[in-house]
């Protein structure tokens, strides 16, 4: 008579199956643990934060510029205020200022003349160009640690204020701004 260990049959198959299952489970858990234990992302640098916020506000303003009806680009909330199109050109002028100042060039805030941009197509194209120029400047002349984030922070604040003003142009025309519309699922 052959003696067998408890939990096995005469050829040891039951113990082998149990061992294989435990080994597989351990391997699976180890794989999951390694995948989940990736090091956390390092905190954003001031340059990365600046670019993210700058891109964010410009994306919102560009979306409004593209969305607002062309026949309403001359609309003014009050006679003495800028038209919708002129506000977009003013925001674009801030971008031109930021890009030049970011490269160390002499820059004036309102050096862009709104009279040179009469149509929605012209205004949107100029805004897109100014955004691309800012992106190129931020890439070529990154904000180093300890370096001031001016002019970028001032232009971001300014553009954000005008974004809020542009919402009023939408509402005064019975329109819903893009960011306030229900998101499709």
Task: Write out the residue ranges for each language-model feature.
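Acidic/histidine-rich alpha-helical segments that form the ligand environment
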Residues: 115-163
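Acidic/histidine-rich, surface-exposed loop or edge segments in extracytoplasmic proteins
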Residues: 39-46, 104-116
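Short, contiguous alpha-helical
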Residues: 51-55, 59-62, 72-111, 144-185
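Membrane-proximal, proline-rich intrinsically disordered regions
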Residues: 68-69
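Boundary at the C-terminal end of the N-terminal hydrophobic targeting segment
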Residues: 35-37
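Well-ordered alpha-helical scaffold segments within catalytic/enzyme domains
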Residues: 60, 64-65, 99, 133, ...
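Bacterial N-terminal signal peptides that target proteins for export
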Residues: 4-27
